[in-house]
Each structure stands twice: as structure tokens, then as C-alpha cells.
Amino acid sequence: YEMTSSLVGSEMCIRDRIWNAPDCNFQRAQKRMQRFGMILERFISPEGAFPVFGRSITYRTGTLQPLALLAWRGWLPKELSNGQVRVAMTAVINRMFGDNRNFNEKGFLTLGFNGSQPHISDWYTNNGSLYMASLAFLPLGLPADHPFWTDAPQAWTSKKAWGGEEFPKDHAYYE
């Protein structure tokens, strides 16, 4: 997940800072991140959980970085509303941090995914790495009157689907 956001950021820097740099690479990377954001939003279960896979899982809510960045930049695809993304991300954050099992006695994040699980971290992971979880909080940089905060709350895709409500059909992505 962090590679998607890093690629878009790199392409944006190249586009903005290099004379005659083609905009097409940035646009392609941005569209791919938007598509990934749509998939990521669908991964969030009605209970606010998400699939546990990948070597970066100790970053916990850092997995929400692409959605957070899309919202912060105002790049959410038309298929995702601000209210929908806000409510889905909040559900994950509440589930992850609501019971304090992820913090040690001094209030610092522990190595693990949901609790102290140091065996799942890689040799290069340390307690500082865990603060990539804060990437989910990028929207906190948005003003209070931004649509991310003011749009009406909406159920996210999996919540609608499992609740028997109408929800958008997924589709193939073509460039």
C-alpha cells in the first residue's frame, strides 16, 4: 500500500519540478491509486476489520494510507464519497485502537498487528516503524469545513452488501 502513494508522490514531484516532464505518468499513477482505493474500501468488513496479509501489517492502520491520501488531496474517485470513506476509516481505527491492546504501559505502540505480537515483525522493524499507522490520519490536516468532515455519513461497500442494501458492482480496470 505504501508503494502506491509513494509512486504518485514521486510522479507528482517529477511532473511539477522537471521541465517538460510528461503528465501522463502522474495521471496513470493517480488513476491506479484511485482504483486501489476502491479495492481497499471494499476490503473493510462491516465490522471495521480488513484482511491481514503482507509484511507491512505491523503498520496497522497505515494500510489506510491510500484512502487517506486520496481524501486529503481531493482525489477520491467518483465511486467513493467523502462520508463513506470517513465512516469506513473510522470503523477500522476504532476497531484497531478502541481497546488499548496495541499500547504498552508507557502508551507507546507495541510490535504487532493487534496487540503485542513481536514474532510477526521483520528484522528491520522497530518501534519507530509502527508509527506509519499515523498515515491513516492524513485527513486531520483538512479544514473543518472540508467535505470529508461535513458530508453525511454513509455506509461503505461491504457494510451495504452484507446489510442487504444496494451497492455498486465492481468492474475491471482498463487503461
Give a label for each model feature.
Residues 66-175:
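Terminal, non-catalytic domain-edge segments
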Residues 1-9, 14:
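Single conserved hydrophobic/aromatic residue that forms the stacking wall/gate
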Residues 5, 48-64, 117-129:
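Solvent-exposed loop and edge beta-strand segments that line ligand/cofactor-binding
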Residues 11, 15-81:
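Long, well-ordered mid-to-C-terminal structural blocks that present hydrophobic/aromatic surfaces
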